[in-house]
Amino acid sequence: MPKVLAIVLAGGKGERLFPLTSFRSKPSVPFGARYRIVDFVLSNLVNSQIYSIYLLVQYKSQSLIEHIRQNWFFSSVGSDHFVTVVPPQMRMGPEWFQGTADAVFQNIGLIKEHNPDIVLIFGADHIYRMDIRQMIKFHIENNAHVTVAARPVALKHASSFGVIITDPDHRIAGFQEKPKDPIPMPDNPDMAYVSMGNYIFNADILIDALVRAEKKKQHDFGAHVIPDLVGRKCKVYAYDFAKNEIPGIKSYEERGYWRDVGTISAYFDAHMDMLGEKPIFEIYNKMWPIHPARYEGPPVKILDGEIKNSIIAEGALIYGGKIENSFIRSGSIIEKDVEIKDSLIMDDVIIKRNSKLYRVIVDKKNVVYEGEKIGFSAEQDRFRCYIDSSGICILPRAARYNDWIKEINHA
């Protein structure tokens, strides 16, 4: 295997995920009962035996930096085994990162110092499993300069992505970045072939492309670098993500599952995809684990109640009530006679007795008051919650911090 360096772009604002991104970047938003969004790309890299990883951060990065420090460190097994967070250094000038390509250009010295054969440029804000070694194999076998991970999406959604036009041998002949009128796939007029935002570059090609882009003040891979490489007849190929084989995948799972959780509704739906006896994305896969945050507290304790089709993390304390189609993260306390349905309860939340929640996201360090009902009346909810366009109610992080502190001290 060639010498590989991975650069993970983890600086996204995640504005469409507001208010979950009020105090954190999109990659550090909690996901599932034990994870953060960034854990999926990092798990894919480590499971693929890729251990040299730089994580480029920018906006509201402290939460992400702490998560990496506490959960993603390697023992002293060699200088090429690291997950290193890289904030903007501003060595090239006073500006922060101006785009995805500019973020890598500003750290071009790290690439030269590491001296890899190939460089992976991956995003940090998608939910999926991928054996990246198979994409590397495809890249090498095709003698490619650049390989772009790609997948089909419905034509009506393709305007949100970079749309790819390929030759029969998978070489990219055209690239449209977020076009108003995307070109459909030749064999399926209802679908378009789109970039997943994950790239493999030969190191020399990447360095040259970044320097060219900087001279033109072009700062984005999808909008500038990839189209320029295609236009200059470089060997740019598309890797079909649907052909990626993951060990341990069940027959009932969706083939090539990949979700952009950039909106509240998409984020919520991706959670629901993990529930049920036969979920389309099975989080329980010992052969390709998603590595969670370490938790040093006690196990979950359930004293009473009725729990259906839900995932409960360590450290949760459940006194009773009904929980259905929901996620409860670490340290949360659910009192008696509570009803929670189709909801996401994040870390260290207190749900007081006789309260009812339906399609609600309660961010961390919050309290839901005794007898309170959220998710049943938009007219009432708008005074106490953020209501997404999808109708999902969100109680922002620490929105009731003073009351939460009183409950903690009282307990």
From Swiss-Prot:
<feature type="binding site">
    <location>
        <position position="195"/>
    </location>
    <ligand>
        <name>alpha-D-glucose 1-phosphate</name>
    </ligand>
</feature>
<keyword id="KW-0548">Nucleotidyltransferase</keyword>
<keyword id="KW-0320">Glycogen biosynthesis</keyword>
<dbReference type="InterPro" id="IPR029044">
    <property type="entry name" value="Nucleotide-diphossugar_trans"/>
</dbReference>
<dbReference type="GO" id="GO:0008878">
    <property type="term" value="F:glucose-1-phosphate adenylyltransferase activity"/>
</dbReference>
<comment type="similarity">
    <text>Belongs to the bacterial/plant glucose-1-phosphate adenylyltransferase family.</text>
</comment>
<keyword id="KW-0808">Transferase</keyword>
<comment type="subunit">
    <text>Homotetramer.</text>
</comment>
<dbReference type="InterPro" id="IPR011831">
    <property type="entry name" value="ADP-Glc_PPase"/>
</dbReference>
<keyword id="KW-0547">Nucleotide-binding</keyword>
<keyword id="KW-0321">Glycogen metabolism</keyword>
<comment type="function">
    <text>Involved in the biosynthesis of ADP-glucose, a building block required for the elongation reactions to produce glycogen. Catalyzes the reaction between ATP and alpha-D-glucose 1-phosphate (G1P) to produce pyrophosphate and ADP-Glc.</text>
</comment>
<dbReference type="Pfam" id="PF24894">
    <property type="entry name" value="Hexapep_GlmU"/>
</dbReference>
<dbReference type="Pfam" id="PF00483">
    <property type="entry name" value="NTP_transferase"/>
</dbReference>
<comment type="pathway">
    <text>Glycan biosynthesis; glycogen biosynthesis.</text>
</comment>
<keyword id="KW-0067">ATP-binding</keyword>
<dbReference type="InterPro" id="IPR005836">
    <property type="entry name" value="ADP_Glu_pyroP_CS"/>
</dbReference>
<dbReference type="InterPro" id="IPR023049">
    <property type="entry name" value="GlgC_bac"/>
</dbReference>
<dbReference type="InterPro" id="IPR011004">
    <property type="entry name" value="Trimer_LpxA-like_sf"/>
</dbReference>
<feature type="binding site">
    <location>
        <begin position="177"/>
        <end position="178"/>
    </location>
    <ligand>
        <name>alpha-D-glucose 1-phosphate</name>
    </ligand>
</feature>
<protein>
    <recommendedName>
        <fullName>Glucose-1-phosphate adenylyltransferase</fullName>
        <ecNumber>2.7.7.27</ecNumber>
    </recommendedName>
</protein>
<feature type="binding site">
    <location>
        <position position="162"/>
    </location>
    <ligand>
        <name>alpha-D-glucose 1-phosphate</name>
    </ligand>
</feature>
<dbReference type="GO" id="GO:0005524">
    <property type="term" value="F:ATP binding"/>
</dbReference>
<keyword id="KW-0119">Carbohydrate metabolism</keyword>
<dbReference type="InterPro" id="IPR056818">
    <property type="entry name" value="GlmU/GlgC-like_hexapep"/>
</dbReference>
<dbReference type="InterPro" id="IPR005835">
    <property type="entry name" value="NTP_transferase_dom"/>
</dbReference>
<dbReference type="GO" id="GO:0005978">
    <property type="term" value="P:glycogen biosynthetic process"/>
</dbReference>
